[in-house]
Amino acid sequence: ADGYDSDCRYFRWRAEADYHGKTDEVNSILLERWKSSPKNINFYPTGQTTEIQNPDAASVEALGEVTGMSAAERGSSGALLALKITYEKGSALVRTEYNIRKVLGACAGNLVCADGTEQTDVTMLPSAFFAITKQEDGGMVLYGGGYGHGLGMSQNAFFVMAKAGMNY
């Protein structure tokens, strides 16, 4: 697809992500983000509908290893609004694009941009606007577009349009 920002490196991107062996890193990010925004990170032990109150490293560690991740909710634009993380003994629900981008960024090994460049130091996905394809080995391939929250008009497209003399 072509767009005003199709020449920008993050117009389309692809990331390989794998949560195997990254439970400690994922938990650390979740607890850090919980401190900033507790209503957007919820931990649930298996069989419980009530979340863990005031989670700490020990209570989250008791959930065991991460065994899966999946889209839990998408907005009308297709951007991911909630991510479900499945543990051996429970689950976590992660809300807001920033939190989702941080968690999956920790699991991403690399990011290939639209211009073919590869970014290997990924700590956060460029956008919450992506599709998830699960691999047989348990990993995931994330196909995304844009840079930022993934909602509304692309900042890069706006810049290109303004440079071309367009206005509203």
List each language-model region with its residue ranges.
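Conserved, single-site charged/polar hotspot
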Residues: 1-168
